[in-house]
C-alpha cells in the first residue's frame, strides 16, 4: 500500500495537503482543474518535490528517504521525454541503464518490453520516424521496463486524437492486468478515467474534495465531479 500521511507541500503561495491510502493494484484517476495540485502531487510522489510536512510510505518504508532512482515509482509524462538522436531501442533501454551499457539480459528485457507494447521490428527507428501513438508506446515501454510497483501517468496521452487515446488506455489497462501495478493517472477527461480507473481523487485548491469509487461517483452524479460530466 501507498500511504500519504498528512503531507503538506508548499509551492509559493500554493499549498497541497493530503492524507490518503492507495491500495496495491488500485487504478486511480487524479482529476481537478488546472492549478488544483495534480502535478504537485505527482511530482511529490515521484521525488521531484519534497513534502514540507508529513511523509509518504510504501510497504512501511519512507519513500522520501529512498534515492530517486531506487524509489518504487515510475512516471510517464505527456511528452514522453524521448531523445531524438537515439533509436527506439536505446530510448527504452535508458529506463534501466542511463549509460546504455547493456548486458545480454538487459537486451532481452528491452526487446520484451517493446514486444509488449507492439513495437517489435521498430527497434532501430528514430522517434521522428514514428507516429504520435508509436512515440507514446516507446515511453510506455520504458516505464514498463523499470518494473516499479507504482506507475504515475501525468496526462500522458492528452495530445493524441480520441481514437489513439482509447487504444493507449486499453494497452495500459492490459499491461496493468498483467503486472498488477498500482496506477495513478492525472487526467482532465472523465471518459479516459472511466476506461482505465476504478477510483477518483478530485483536487481543488490543493485539497482532496472527492475520494470515491469512480463508477459510484459517476452514478451518483457526485457534485464535485459534475463539471467533468
UniProtKB/Swiss-Prot annotation:
GO molecular function: ABC-type thiamine transporter activity; ATP binding; ATP hydrolysis activity
Main location: membrane
Pfam family, one: ABC_tran
Binding, ATP: 32-39
Compartments, record wording: Cell inner membrane
Catalytic activity: thiamine(out) + ATP + H2O = thiamine(in) + ADP + phosphate + H(+)
Function: Part of the ABC transporter complex ThiBPQ involved in thiamine import. Responsible for energy coupling to the transport system.
KW Flavoprotein (keyword) present: no
Enzyme Commission numbers on file: 7.6.2.15
InterPro entries (alphabetical): AAA+_ATPase (IPR003593), ABC_SmlMolc_Importer (IPR050093), ABC_transporter-like_ATP-bd (IPR003439), ABC_transporter-like_CS (IPR017871), P-loop_NTPase (IPR027417)
Superkingdom to which the source organism belongs: Bacteria
Cellular component aspect of the GO annotation: plasma membrane
Keyword Magnesium: no
UniProt subunit comment: The complex is composed of two ATP-binding proteins (ThiQ), two transmembrane proteins (ThiP) and a solute-binding protein (ThiB).
Domain (ABC transporter): residue spans on this chain: 2-229
Membrane topology: Peripheral membrane protein
Source organism per UniProt: Jannaschia sp. (strain CCS1)
Keywords (A to Z) from UniProt: ATP-binding, Cell inner membrane, Cell membrane, Membrane, Nucleotide-binding, Translocase, Transport
Descriptive protein name: Thiamine import ATP-binding protein ThiQ
Similarity-based family: Belongs to the ABC transporter superfamily. Thiamine importer (TC 3.A.1.19.1) family.
Amino acid at each position: 500500500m501507498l500511504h500519504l500521511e498528512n503531507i503538506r507541500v508548499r509551492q509559493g503561495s500554493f499549498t497541497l495537503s493530503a492524507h490518503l491510502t492507495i491500495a496495491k493494484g488500485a487504478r486511480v484517476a487524479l482529476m481537478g482543474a488546472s492549478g488544483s495540485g495534480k502535478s504537485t502531487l505527482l511530482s511529490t510522489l515521484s521525488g521531484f518535490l519534497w513534502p514540507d510536512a508529513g511523509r509518504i510510505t510504501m510497504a512501511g518504508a519512507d519513500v522520501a528517504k529512498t534515492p530517486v532512482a531506487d524509489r518504487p515509482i515510475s512516471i510517464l509524462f505527456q511528452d514522453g521525454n524521448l531523445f531524438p538522436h537515439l533509436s527506439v531501442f536505446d530510448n527504452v533501454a535508458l529506463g534501466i541503464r542511463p549509460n546504455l551499457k547493456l548486458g545480454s539480459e538487459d537486451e532481452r528485457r528491452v526487446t520484451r518490453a517493446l514486444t509488449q507494447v507492439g513495437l517489435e521490428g521498430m527497434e532501430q527507428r528514430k522517434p521522428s520516424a514514428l507516429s504520435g501513438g508509436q512515440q507514446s508506446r516507446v515511453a510506455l515501454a520504458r516505464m514498463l521496463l523499470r518494473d516499479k510497483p507504482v506507475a504515475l501517468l501525468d496526462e500522458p496521452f492528452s495530445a493524441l486524437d480520441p481514437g489513439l487515446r482509447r487504444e493507449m488506455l486499453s494497452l495500459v489497462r492490459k499491461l496493468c492486468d498483467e503486472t498488477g501495478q498500482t496506477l495513478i493517472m492525472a487526467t482532465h477527461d472523465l471518459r479516459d478515467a472511466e476506461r482505465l480507473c476504478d477510483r477518483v481523487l478530485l483536487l481543488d485548491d490543493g485539497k482532496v474534495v472527492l475520494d470515491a469509487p469512480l463508477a459510484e461517483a459517476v452514478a451518483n452524479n457526485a457534485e464535485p465531479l459534475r463539471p467533468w460530466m
